[in-house]
Amino acid sequence: MWRSWLREAHQSFERLPYESKQDRVVEDISKAIMSIKEAIFGEDEQSSSKEHAQGIASEACRVGLVSDLVTYLTVLDFETRKDVVQIFCAIIRITLEDGGRPGRDYVLAHPDVLSTLFYGYEDPEIALNCGQMFRECIRHEDIAKFVLECNLFEELFEKLNVQSFEVASDAFATFKDLLTRHKQLVAAFLQENYEDFFSQLDKLLTSDNYVTRRQSLKLLGELLLDRVNVKIMMQYVSDVNNLILMMNLLKDSSRSIQFEAFHVFKVFVANPNKTKPVADILVNNKNKLLTYLEDFHNDRDDEQFKEEKAVIIKEISMMHA
């Protein structure tokens, strides 16, 4: 039965551009999509059939329905779009009995699927749907590697600064997933593309948008403190310009940004092999830093933070020219 639903959906999608009255075709598509969803996930309390789900994933990729789902997302109604997201994500996740992953392989063979999803961020109507499907794709390391190495990653920086809070936040969720899920892959990528990546990140850290500054600063701290990125961390904290940026963010009007900046600033101070420019800045600003840190977030009920702050204050107080 599910084969006929797949065939009906695919044929309807193919007819759609040539129909003068699309409403009826869209209605047929919506019904077929609902039936496909029920075949994958089960209806009501009934459990779904694993065999059906695997069959649907394979067939949807074979006939090109996966591309249809993302290409024509804009013409579907709100509820059908949600069904499409569920179906698409299931297809991308499904592993066959022989270990095959038809959804992953389809996307790798048809990278236009990724481009369509990515540029969906430009349409507020479907932006969040596209973001969710894009993130499902990059759960696969092969796809994440492709995205990091193509123009989409560079363009993603632009999506983080769009006017819409919802779209910018979703784009940042994608950005974070891409940089934290596959740690070894990302560590190698950051080492190879250090200058380009951090020059782009600096723009986010100095953005006029508060949310952009805070989220990018928090992500920076997470990246630097991850053991797999130790080489990146050492390179970052050796640059005096990065220290100056963090010292400025320590004094940001937002307490949240101050707090996130502290977690990066402490890495500069704790580094036993400081470069001379970094050490000079810390020594030259020693008294100001100590005065500022003594009263820094004293009302925060966080024992680990209090201990770390005490260590940083002690380390700075022991520094001398």
UniProtKB/Swiss-Prot annotation:
Q: Which InterPro entries match?
A: ARM-like, ARM-type_fold, Mo25
SUPFAM superfamilies documented for this protein: ARM repeat
Quote one Gene Ontology molecular function term.
Answer: protein serine/threonine kinase activator activity
What is the superkingdom listed in this entry's lineage? Eukaryota
Which biological process annotations from GO are given for this protein?
intracellular signal transduction
Under Pfam families, the record lists: Mo25
**Family membership:** Belongs to the Mo25 family.
- This chain's protein is named Degreening-related gene dee76 protein
In its UniProt entry, the species of origin is given as: Auxenochlorella protothecoides
This protein's gene is called DEE76
